[in-house]
């Protein structure tokens, strides 16, 4: 099991966390199976960026109907995985008082889906904060499989008390 590993800040640089496992993600956000769409996070820079990892498996419920002969992960679920990665980053940044709080989508802009994602793929979801003001955060997200971009979007969300 992965452990949360913090790297102390040097000067004014933000705090980094090497990796967190799914149990720590579930402490941060309220999502649960079958709608918890990230398995692990790595390369976390608090207040700035993170990478979420989703191991796509054939047993996921959406593949029963999307599409049985050629399973494709719905694009909206890839965007949701970006949002869950960003929400976890927000909670880790703001601290324990925000654990389990809801983070709601406000906008999704420029969503592009470049290639299908299916069973056996590993999504690496890179999110980077573009800006934040009070409880509203805006992110750019890019999902990749084997280093190739499969989806991207810019989105904003609000953390609710």
Swiss-Prot record:
Origin species: Gluconacetobacter diazotrophicus (strain ATCC 49037 / DSM 5601 / CCUG 37298 / CIP 103539 / LMG 7603 / PAl5)
Catalytic residues, chain numbering: 66
Lipid metabolism recorded as keyword: yes
PANTHER family documented for this protein: 3-HYDROXYACYL-[ACYL-CARRIER-PROTEIN] DEHYDRATASE
NCBIfam families in alphabetical order: fabZ, PRK00006.1
Biological processes annotated in GO: fatty acid biosynthetic process; lipid A biosynthetic process
Function: Involved in unsaturated fatty acids biosynthesis. Catalyzes the dehydration of short chain beta-hydroxyacyl-ACPs and long chain saturated and unsaturated beta-hydroxyacyl-ACPs.
Gene: fabZ
Catalytic activity: a (3R)-hydroxyacyl-[ACP] = a (2E)-enoyl-[ACP] + H2O
Its EC number(s): 4.2.1.59
GO molecular function: (3R)-hydroxyacyl-[acyl-carrier-protein] dehydratase activity
Location of this chain's protein in the cell: Cytoplasm
Name of the protein in question: 3-hydroxyacyl-[acyl-carrier-protein] dehydratase FabZ
Entry GO CC: cytoplasm; membrane
């Amino acid at each position: 099991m992965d452990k949360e590993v913090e790297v102390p800040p040097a000067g004014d640089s933000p705090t980094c966390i090497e990796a967190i496992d799914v149990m720590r993600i579930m402490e941060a956000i309220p999502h649960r199976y079958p709608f918890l769409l990230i398995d692990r996070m790595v390369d976390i820079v608090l207040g700035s960026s993170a990478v979420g990892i989703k191991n796509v498996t054939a047993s996921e419920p959406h593949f029963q109907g999307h599409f049985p002969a050629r399973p494709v992960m719905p694009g909206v679920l890839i965007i949701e995985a970006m949002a869950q990665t960003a929400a976890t980053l927000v909670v880790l940044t703001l601290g324990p008082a925000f654990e389990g709080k809801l983070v709601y989508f406000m906008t999704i802009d420029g969503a592009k889906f470049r290639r299908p994602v299916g069973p056996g793929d590993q999504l690496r979801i890179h999110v980077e904060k573009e800006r934040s003001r009070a409880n509203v955060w805006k992110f750019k997200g890019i999902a990749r499989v084997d280093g190739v971009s499969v989806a991207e979007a810019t989105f904003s969300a609000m953390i609710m008390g």
